[in-house]
Amino acid sequence: MHTVQKDTTFTKIFVGGLPYHTTDASLRKYFEVFGDIDEAVVITDRQTAKSRGYGFVTMSDRAAAERACKDPNPIIDGRKANVNLAYLGAKPRNLQSAFTIGVQQLHPAFIQRPFGLTPQYIYPPTIVQPSMVIPTPIPSLQSPYIDYNAATQAYTHYTTAAYEQYPYAASPATGYMGYGYTSPVQQPLSTTTGAPPTAYIQYQPQQLQPDRMQ
């Protein structure tokens, strides 16, 4: 007959931050005050037989495991340990400090733009020939997480199909600036350094006033 394995999801505890001299006996001694223990094991180095800094304790019931994990700063063998249910992993030491460090290390160029929208193209109301397209060295920024300066050198030239534009520009006589939007098709980043991509600005012809044509 096969022995039914006991579910230890809510009873098995991960214990981190243990000193080198911690043993199975000392680990069990700390946790036995919270309830009955099925197993207490310190993971040791094969060569030195010393603690590798972590171990596992399996309590007999869920309530005992919850009591053992309640203390946010447990001291085991004279050292502050990290105790949490094994399936959840180690507890973060300090959520506030971890958040502060993460914000300080975040470069402003990597901050995501609202809604992840790509930059828009402006169509100024200048009197030029219809459908005239003038290339200008304006970098195209597709990914909100890519460094703006490095992107101009990392991107390869995009095909004209990737720049499908929708002329939603208003009439120049209204005095409003029209906007076009790029296609959501994105090309993969190139590992080699290339020339900055060329964006295109399209100028709409301006309608002449009837009194000026006389």
Curated annotation (Swiss-Prot):
Compartments reported by the entry: Cytoplasm, Cytosol; Nucleus
Domain of life: Eukaryota
Gene3D superfamilies reported for this sequence: 3.30.70.330
InterPro entries in the cross-refs: Nucleotide-bd_a/b_plait_sf (IPR012677), RBD_domain_sf (IPR035979), RNA-binding_reg (IPR050886), RRM_dom (IPR000504)
CDD domains reported for this sequence: RRM_RBM24_RBM38_like
SUPFAM superfamilies found in the cross-reference section: RNA-binding domain, RBD (SSF54928)
Keyword Transmembrane listed: no
Tissue expression notes: Strongly expressed in the nervous system. Expressed at early neurula stages of development.
Keyword Cell division: no
Domain spans labelled RRM: 11-88
Gene Ontology CC terms: cytosol; nucleus
One Gene Ontology MF term: mRNA 3'-UTR binding
GO BP: cell differentiation; mRNA processing; regulation of RNA splicing; RNA splicing
Annotated keywords: Cytoplasm, Developmental protein, Differentiation, mRNA processing, mRNA splicing, Nucleus, RNA-binding
Pfam families for this protein: RRM_1
Signal peptide segment: none
Family: Belongs to the RBM38 family.
The protein's role, per its UniProt record: RNA-binding protein that specifically bind the 3'-UTR of VegT transcripts, leading to maintain their stability and stimulate their translation, thereby playing a role in germ layer formation. VegT is a localized maternal determinant essentially required for endoderm formation. Also has some proneural function in the open neural plate and in the context of retinogenesis. May also act as a mRNA splicing factor. May play a role in myogenic differentiation.
Protein known as: RNA-binding protein 38
Source species of the chain: Xenopus laevis (African clawed frog)
Lineage: Eukaryota, Metazoa, Chordata, Craniata, Vertebrata
Gene behind this protein: rbm38
